[in-house]
From Swiss-Prot:
One of its GO terms (molecular function) is tRNA binding. The lineage of its organism: Bacteria, Pseudomonadati, Pseudomonadota, Gammaproteobacteria, Oceanospirillales. Keywords: Ribonucleoprotein, Ribosomal protein. It comes from the Bacteria. Part of the 30S ribosomal subunit. The keyword Ribonucleoprotein applies. HAMAP family: Ribosomal_uS10. This is Small ribosomal subunit protein uS10. Belongs to the universal ribosomal protein uS10 family. It comes from Chromohalobacter salexigens (strain ATCC BAA-138 / DSM 3043 / CIP 106854 / NCIMB 13768 / 1H11). It holds the Pfam family Ribosomal_S10. The keyword Ribosomal protein applies. GO terms for cellular component: ribonucleoprotein complex; ribosome. GO terms for biological process: translation. Transmembrane segments: none annotated.
Length: 103
């Protein structure tokens, strides 16, 4: 697996959860002898929704909601077989979306 790179993208709504998951991945990769770059924070997406409170009149009465999507990127340079096996067995939190890419 020489001259390869694993890129891991993490997405979550809770920044504490994504930081904890990123730290678990970094610890696992370093324990197996791989070199890690990151976690690199990417820009946070903020989606805002405005909802009318009143069912009939009062156009001024509105509620605003927001959901933030936090993202992180990790690069694992020169992974070993142990690194790949350990990452496959790693159990991360349920609220974190993980995308793994081999380059």
């Amino acid at each position: 697996m020489q001259n390869q790179k694993i890129r891991i993208r993490l997405k979550a709504f809770d920044h504490r959860l994504i930081d904890q998951s990123a730290q678990e991945i970094v610890d696992t990769a370093k324990r197996t002898g791989a070199q890690v770059r990151g976690p690199i924070p990417l820009p946070t997406n903020r989606e805002r929704y405005t909802v009318l409170i009143s069912p009939h009149v009062n156009k001024d009465a509105r509620d605003q909601y927001e959901i933030r999507t936090h993202k992180r990127v990790l690069d694992i340079v020169e992974p070993t077989e142990k690194t790949v096996d350990a990452l496959m067995k790693l159990d991360l939190a349920a609220g974190v979306d993980v995308q793994i890419k081999l380059d």
